[in-house]
């Protein structure tokens, strides 16, 4: 990058000339080399002693960003949220896959997911959700050794190019503010 080049102009100047001659797709591609470490196996292996989802319940809710504790699972704010209110439902046990969960864990993860959706609607007034689990390193899980379900509130028009071009996310509320509001919502609705 030259002295006058910004991340925006650098990204805009990258040209993608790859097209199959028989099937032009008309898509432009934005290359994100900063993700190479992640997709090439840069994720850490966690043990029960080093796993952030195993150590979080032993700390205060404020310190760990936990918004609700159940018997077999808990709900925690994502430390690296896609949107304000991005929650994770985690079993207390250090298990990597959904089919490793007991019947009681499976039931409580489902119940906490439903409750979290109600809380987020009340607190955030979102328009929809993305809900899911990435399992295993090749499945895209950032912490592959400890099962967790993402609950991502969505609003109309909440997608933009800032994360890709400027490595910046716009967040309308701090994690602390969201933790308090969501924890209060869980207290009211559970």
Segments and roles (model prediction):
Residues 1-190:
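HIT superfamily nucleotide-processing domains
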């Amino acid at each position: 990058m030259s002295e006058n080049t910004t991340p925006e102009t650098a990204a805009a100047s990258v040209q993608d000339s790859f097209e199959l001659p028989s099937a032009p797709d008309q898509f432009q591609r934005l290359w994100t080399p900063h993700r190479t470490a992640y997709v090439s196996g840069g994720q850490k292996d966690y043990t029960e002693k080093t796993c952030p989802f195993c150590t979080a319940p032993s700390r205060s809710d404020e310190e760990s960003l936990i918004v609700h504790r159940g018997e077999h699972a808990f709900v925690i704010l994502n430390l690296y949220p896609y949107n304000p209110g991005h929650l994770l439902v985690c079993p207390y046990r250090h298990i990597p896959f959904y089919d490793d969960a007991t019947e009681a864990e499976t039931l409580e993860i489902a119940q906490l997911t439903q409750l979290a959706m109600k809380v987020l609607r009340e607190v955030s007034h979102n328009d929809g959700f993305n809900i899911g689990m990435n399992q295993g390193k090749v499945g895209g899980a950032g912490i592959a050794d400890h099962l967790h379900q993402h609950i991502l509130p969505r609003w109309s028009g909440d997608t933009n190019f800032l994360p890709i071009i400027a490595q910046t996310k716009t967040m309308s509320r701090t994690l602390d503010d969201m933790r308090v509001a969501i924890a209060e919502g869980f207290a009211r609705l559970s």
